[in-house]
Amino acid sequence: MNSQVIIFDTTLRDGEQALQASLSVKQKLQIALSLENAGIDIIEVGFPISSPGDFKSVQTISKNIKNSRICSLARCLNKDIDTAAEAMSSSNTFRIHIFLATSTLHMESKLKKNFDQIIDMAISSVKRALRYTDDVEFSCEDASRTTMDNLCRIVEQLIKAGVKTINIPDTVGYTVPNELSTIIHNLFKRVPNIDQSIISVHCHNDLGMAVGNSISAIQAGARQIEGTINGIGERAGNTALEEVIMAIKVREDILGVSTNIKHKEIYRTSQIISQICNLPIPPNKAIVGSNAFAHSSGIHQDGVLKNRKNYEIMEPSSIGLKEVKLNLTSRSGRAAVKYYMTQMGYKECDYNIDELYTSFLKLADKKGQVFDYDLEALAFINMQQEESEYFSLSFFSVQSISNGLSTASVKLLCGKKVSIESATTSNGPIDAIYQALNRITNFPITLQKYQLVAKGKGRDALGQVDILVEYKKRKFHGVGLATDIIESSAQAMVNVLNNIWKANQVNEKLKTLKKVNN
């Protein structure tokens, strides 16, 4: 049996379902590029039929990813399959991932079909997908609650039809490891043409066993694991791929398999996705949590100092976790900043050096010395900025008055031409600034979430503000970064206003296209 395990990442499709606000095309591309850089084999980049935005994201990513294989999801509907193929048409090689429920519960209560009809739908859709690519994956939704007889029957027919990858999802995270292992064993035992296809598993974490189930499936013969970085996903999440990958590496003696993953890119990829998705990593998270390599017990600390292997089964450097000693000040030049960015794993194409250096100098003037975590935070904000933002904050001031009230004055540059000023008194400085900015744009928004996170150490640490607003029943996310909390809060709101403005522009273009087509 092949000892290579294919890693299938669905952060951009299944993982995005956990987010309160959709990611922009640029953010999705950043994630896809980081996954490609980490050596991910298959990147499921979206569900193109679901929205024009998802279609555009898949289309854009397909044009830019060269080393990983692109994959899109489709239901057993011709329009889904055709749209998926169209969105990925610029890629030399791509996969179409079709799914259909096979459990009795889903067939009777959701689909209102019998099993013969399910097989006919599945085979018809596979034939449709094979018109576009020879790489077709089929997922038997709710496979872990499908009868073994039915599962074996449909898998055999799918392989005969030309499916190269059969996915066995534990859709609701119901299975336990030995149960999933038995399912995989039975498929290998009872399906005569099973050797003509790769068996994959897609485990959810509702009972906290997604990683354990995935490992047991590997031991039973599965050779593709589906999941997300940091385990993000709806409900309790998906299989955390970084945990499976490192389990395979550390316990190769037991599992006897390997992956194509560049292990030293794991930590950076995890951090990028955490920041872009605005989903903080718990400190005790395996592999990538801030406490994963921390030792507080005196006995443990003494043991680690004598020999790290006493209490560490892997080195921090094995996932790319290393401390970069920075000594940057306002006298440091562009070359020094570029050098340290390279040391931290960034490529020159990842960021705009002119904009990053300008932000660096402003911070260096305030703090004196810039540390690695400062530069990392600045780089993240730099990478989020679009080439041309419609709104930009040119001035703000806040004055606190009696009874907890504050007055804010702002000047907003609109379209790089028109400068508009506004002033408002409200409860607290941040709300006053938000009210003043909203007076200018007149967007009917409601603030739903405000989060402040320190990016660094000490009193002069950078503060990152993440906000979530609702605008016309849609959620929009914004982020700002500064040593001053009020300034970072203002930047976050301007970021939101730009995101809303861009969404409105897209909607206007779609309306125009519909009128032309009609």
UniProtKB/Swiss-Prot annotation:
Molecular function (Gene Ontology), one example: manganese ion binding
Cofactor(s) in the UniProt record: Mn(2+)
A Gene Ontology biological process term: L-leucine biosynthetic process
Keyword annotations from UniProtKB, A to Z: Amino-acid biosynthesis, Branched-chain amino acid biosynthesis, Cytoplasm, Leucine biosynthesis, Manganese, Metal-binding, Plasmid, Transferase
Gene3D superfamilies named among the record's database cross-references: 1.10.238.260, 3.30.160.270, Aldolase class I
Principal location class: cytoplasm
Catalytic activity: 3-methyl-2-oxobutanoate + acetyl-CoA + H2O = (2S)-2-isopropylmalate + CoA + H(+)
S-adenosyl-L-methionine in keyword set: no
InterPro entries (UniProt xref): 2-IPM_HCS-like, 2-isopropylmalate_synth_dimer, AIPM/Hcit_synth_CS, Aldolase_TIM, LeuA/HCS_post-cat, LeuA_allosteric_dom_sf, LeuA_bact_synth, PYR_CT
Pathway: Amino-acid biosynthesis; L-leucine biosynthesis; L-leucine from 3-methyl-2-oxobutanoate: step 1/4
Domain Pyruvate carboxyltransferase: 5-267
Residues the record lists as binding Mn(2+): 14, 202, 204, 238
SUPFAM superfamilies assigned: 2-isopropylmalate synthase LeuA, allosteric (dimerisation) domain, Aldolase
GO-annotated cellular components: cytosol
Family: Belongs to the alpha-IPM synthase/homocitrate synthase family. LeuA type 1 subfamily.
Subunit comment: Homodimer.
Role summary: Catalyzes the condensation of the acetyl group of acetyl-CoA with 3-methyl-2-oxobutanoate (2-ketoisovalerate) to form 3-carboxy-3-hydroxy-4-methylpentanoate (2-isopropylmalate).
Protein name in the entry: 2-isopropylmalate synthase
Encoding gene per record: leuA
